[in-house]
Structures are given as C-alpha cells and as structure tokens.
Amino acid sequence: MTKKVFIFSASTGAGHNLAARSLAEALQGRGYDAQVYDAFKESSAALNRIVTKGYKQLVEIAPKLYEQMYHQFNKMTPFQQNIFKVMSKVMNPEIVPLIEKEGPDLIISTHPFVTNMLGTLKAHGAFNQPVLSFVTDYKIHSVYLHPMIDAYVVGSEYTKQTMVERGVSPDIIYPFGIPIRTEFMDAPSEGSEKGDPAVRGTIMVM
C-alpha cells in the first residue's frame, strides 16, 4: 500500500514552498503519495492574508520592526506561545478534518509557524501521526522548536548544535541538508559539458 505524506508550508517567502515542492517531487519519485498544502491558505483566508501579505509588507516597509519582532519571538515567552495557540485554533477548522479524512502516514512541515502550530495541535490530541520538521534556516529560531515534533531535518551540523544547546535531543536531529529541486542534484556545469578543464564545477548561491 502506498504511503501517504502531507507536506505543509506557508507563503511567507518562496523558499518554504519551494522546499515543500522539492520534497514532494523527491518522495513521489520514490513511490510515495506526497501532497503539498499551504497551511494558512487551506484554513483561514484572513489568517493567510495577515501572515503572507503582512510578512511581505513588514519586511519591505519596516525592516527594523521586523528584525525586532524576529528577535522577540526567538525568546518564545508564554506570551509568544499563547499567540501560536490562538493561531493553531484558527488553523484547526480545515487542517484537522483534512488529516482525519485522508489519514496520512507522515506529516511534514517546511515552515516554522506551521511546525509550531502542528506541534500545538498534536499536543491537544488533534491527531497522532508523526510530525517531521524540515528546518530551512541555517540558524535555528525558537518558533521551530516544539516538544511534540518527532524529528527535525536540518541544513548543517552547526544548526544541529544550536538546537542541542536549546534542549532538543540530538537523537531526533538529522543534518541531511535543505531540500533542493531534483534538476540541481546532478546538473553539470556549462563548462564541464563543453569539456573545459578550467571549470571545476557548479556553485549554487542560495
């Protein structure tokens, strides 16, 4: 029987969605039924506008304020935790019935907000499937961290170490790298295709 995987992301910057699509493509190529969902778009139109458009406008118009908010949420005080509890309740009406109806074998998140909210929903008994978080940032942010997340895939040993320093068990952190599109996996450089000995390889700037 084909294993079913749900991959949740959010449209705050293209990177999280691109990672989700890259994962789905890789899993589908290995025989999994992998589906990508925008967690906010699938749940609440109002929340989706606030998170996606609000994020974009904040970064463009008030980058200093965004920086302050970034560092404030990195502390994850009870106040910040309560915000995510409220957000998880807004997300709940559509996401949880979808999980109950389709019964995925694994749930993956490529976005820190979604990771935290899925952990909160799982903590309240909304579902019991394992949740895997793909950390698409090299420097960990506290929003990614939730005790109900079963495993993390991170981009480097450095990221793993910063998570261990914050109390996450090293046994559930896997420094396998950040997902990329399959066409980049074995893409030869233009020079190497032409047999240019001066070209040693291809560098992808992220």
Residue ranges and their predicted role:
Residues 2-6:
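Extreme N-terminal starter segment of soluble prokaryotic enzymes
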Residues 150-206:
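A nucleotide-sugar donor-handling region in carbohydrate enzymes
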Residues 44, 116, 141, 180-183:
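Generic structural signal for helix capping and beta-alpha/helix-loop junctions
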Residues 22-96:
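Conserved N-terminal ligand/cofactor-binding loop architecture of enzyme catalytic domains
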Residues 47, 144-145, 185-188:
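Short, well-ordered secondary-structure micro-motifs
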